[in-house]
């Protein structure tokens, strides 16, 4: 095989923009060291703007540069692809103190090239001539420096034209997403970004994987594919306004249109105690198209969901008589405990007592009612019943989550996702009415109940960590804890507790509730006096954080 020196000039940047037609590469020519003669065939990028393999965001698009160890592939006269064996990238970088990139480069490649056109491929630093791997786990260490894309999935193709010397325009064929979150929310002031995760609602989608690539840059035959990509970053800051210099983070993904796309930002949030909280903030998009060779900017104002303080009730208390009625956080006379371990017996409802003239916030008094006691008729009348709670518990595919939210001036992370009732009904060939009438074991526990607090407690330990893929099929409940004797606040940010509409059929002090934490969901009968949340199964998105 003969060696022939072929000059490849002008790597022109194909538009990598916010829209499919606008070119936004505003790079200017950079000064570098003189070209160093080597043996072999020469491929050279000389004219700006040029397509390269490291990227920075300019405010209107991605500007690319060559980095150390970049390689290209060229098809010779025998239709065999050869990888460049040498280049002058290192010399050019060394000629500019402090630089890690260069605007120009020459590559030397073996092979025989006599045609007027030769195919060129770039398959990333770890690619073969016909294989591209877009990684599911990517890392960017410095804001607005996406040098990692060469390692994590960037690829492109070109037609080199000429005679003796060849020029080509390298067309990037990967899709790029540049995240630039900011926040106007004081709850997360000073927070750092740890990672950004994006996934689609269809687990069969191929956001990442290993693919075959043809001369047109079209991908096929994916293996080890996934619908989720995670970009780990190095404690990027979150400014109060969009600033690409502060935190632009670029992800490489497979081009395509994806539905029910979730973008999850994992943050480390400082707290007054000095111990930071790690949690997530998530945005959901119904449909997103990532075009080949284009960059999609994502500019998001990150905010935490703030839950109300007046949503705790004893079981079926009078409508409007929440646990701290008249003394709520934020009221004219705030006496409500706001952090775990605080209590206020002076202003709390009377311990273990039903509603009375002196205890208007107490639970419904059934001491004189005939058994079985009727379902809730007041504040808990629209809550799910015990049978529905058991369907959620055992057929709701619970997923624990660390989504961030706030309550009474403090930030917390923790909650549970459950399948929506309509999804559960469809998957189990039931109607909504049938879910209300009997539990999964075909028993109506509204009539039978059980002895609470013991071995009869219904427990599901099969809880999956992390959000489900298709969030539209699920609803969310936060771990808002509860109030107990003497108004003691417990388990805020740790445990979720919700009343049902179902009293124990014969015990006037007991009612059913559903509760959960990171590894367990349970349904049980317990004391009616607990200050828990109310949940209406016909309004499942009431607590949804985004």
Specify the residue positions occupied by each region the protein language model found.
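Sec-type signal peptide cleavage vicinity
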Residues: 2-394, 399-406, 412, 417, ...
